[in-house]
Amino acid sequence: MNLNLSLEEVRKLSENYNVIPLYTELLVDTETPLSIFLKLKEKGQFNILLESAEGGEKWGRYSFIITGSSFYLRTRKDIGEIYERGKVNFFETKDPLSKIKEVVKKFIPYHDERLPRFWGGLVGYFAYDVVKFYEPVEDKNPDPIHTYDIYLVLTDVVVIHDNLTGKIKVVVPIFAQNGIEEEYERAKNLIRDTVKKLKERGTTFLNVVEKEPDFKNWRSNFTKEEFEDIVKKAKEYIAQGDVIQVVLSQRFRKRFKGNPDNIYRVLRFLNPSPYMYYLDFDQLKVIGSSPEILVRLEEGRIETRPIAGTRKRGRTEEEDKRLEEDLLSDEKERAEHLMLVDLARNDIGRVAKTGSVRVENFMRIERYSHVMHIVSDVVGELREGYDALDVLKATFPAGTVSGAPKVRAMQIIEELENERRGIYAGSVGYISFQGNMDMAIAIRTAVYRDRDIFVQAGAGIVADSVPEKEWEETVNKAKALMKAIEIAEESQEE
């Protein structure tokens, strides 16, 4: 087995760095990221798959399969716990992001130029309710799913699948402070075991049964009348001038009798998206196909991409072009998009160098598998003294899932919705050893816990919203995920 570094080379690098990637490279052109994930996943350990389909039409260059961890950090309300090398320490906090900062600041990584921008770090999610630590928003609603507010796993084994070449790199970080020889041996053994599993294990085929979702199988936390009532109340706040827009959501749940792995398998071909993820945290699983970035930080460049304005895809190229023109000439859609662009500029401006915030590719159309959207890029340069956690705090949660002005909209959401949002409308992604970050908005995302499956969807309420139409919008948004879940439940593994 060829490795990128010898023990002596690692020892030399450890004079300047305390996190050093050890890896081997293999040609596995008969495998897919999903088949690799299914071969490597183990019950009782952390298993994560991160993929991307650019524009929903072609797969991104790299997919990441992450297994195992000897460290995690998770919080629920003001109590947190850190698991490290077999020991659990509990802590109280009113500022959980500062605790994560402490962890990230310890890393001094060596970056091998042959590796992509992510090869390890913290991976997981931030629930929507984390914002209640940092903004004057109450936390009074019940939490029926009982998920953690923050759940981050430090990567152990990362398999980087290059979708262009068919090669993989099996990467394990060496933590110098734990002893160079011991860590080198540990990393080498993990790489060897991972390669062995890939060679020995088979995968199953899925006999897919196409069907439309049966809405009777699902139970919402609102009746239709109750949801229409909260839309009316939101419109009263809008009429009084409290907010311009507020995003209200409802949550659907059902008992799930199948294999949760198959939800991701079905979702992957039904609705490929820029951010696809499967976080398998044993009893808790987060399965998503999000079209929308929350924020990205890469080498000091901050980027977010407000998405607002939607049309269904046409059946032909000519119909697509007509629908694009119709979307770009819709004053209501343009106004909503402009509001979100302004919100993004303000958010990034809190942590960017003065004068560096700008809008690029303003109001272009991006096509996805089933819909097209108006998209703009808002970028800026990170101000001295700030890091990924500051950027997350400044931009969290997205305006597309809260409203504008953001703080007042969130206060109204807390008043009118009847349950904690949890993972919905939060973010899923990573903070790398180098301090880079890529976070998706947790929409079009299913949460599986103890054989129950939850799907949540929202609608942006504005002055001229029709309550029944807004209820229909939340149902229609949820249906794509419901369809994947019900197909997964009916399909047979072979």
From Swiss-Prot:
Feedback inhibited by tryptophan. Chorismate binds at residues 309-310, 424, 444, 458-460. GO terms for molecular function: anthranilate synthase activity; metal ion binding. Coiled coil: none annotated. Keywords: Amino-acid biosynthesis, Aromatic amino acid biosynthesis, Lyase, Magnesium, Metal-binding, Tryptophan biosynthesis. Transmembrane segments: none annotated. Mg(2+) binds at residues 336, 473. Pathway: Amino-acid biosynthesis; L-tryptophan biosynthesis; L-tryptophan from chorismate: step 1/5. It catalyses: chorismate + L-glutamine = anthranilate + pyruvate + L-glutamate + H(+). Its cofactor is Mg(2+). It holds the Pfam family Chorismate_bind. The keyword Cytoplasm does not apply. Its EC number is 4.1.3.27. InterPro entries: ADC_synthase, Anth_synth_I-like, Anth_synth_I_N, Anth_synth_I_PabB, Chorismate_C. GO terms for biological process: L-tryptophan biosynthetic process. Binds 1 Mg(2+) ion per subunit. It comes from the Bacteria. NCBIfam families: trpE_most. Heterotetramer consisting of two non-identical subunits: a beta subunit (TrpG) and a large alpha subunit (TrpE). Belongs to the anthranilate synthase component I family. Part of a heterotetrameric complex that catalyzes the two-step biosynthesis of anthranilate, an intermediate in the biosynthesis of L-tryptophan. In the first step, the glutamine-binding beta subunit (TrpG) of anthranilate synthase (AS) provides the glutamine amidotransferase activity which generates ammonia as a substrate that, along with chorismate, is used in the second step, catalyzed by the large alpha subunit of AS (TrpE) to produce anthranilate. In the absence of TrpG, TrpE can synthesize anthranilate directly from chorismate and high concentrations of ammonia. This is Anthranilate synthase component 1. It comes from Aquifex aeolicus (strain VF5). The lineage of its organism: Bacteria, Pseudomonadati, Aquificota, Aquificia, Aquificales.
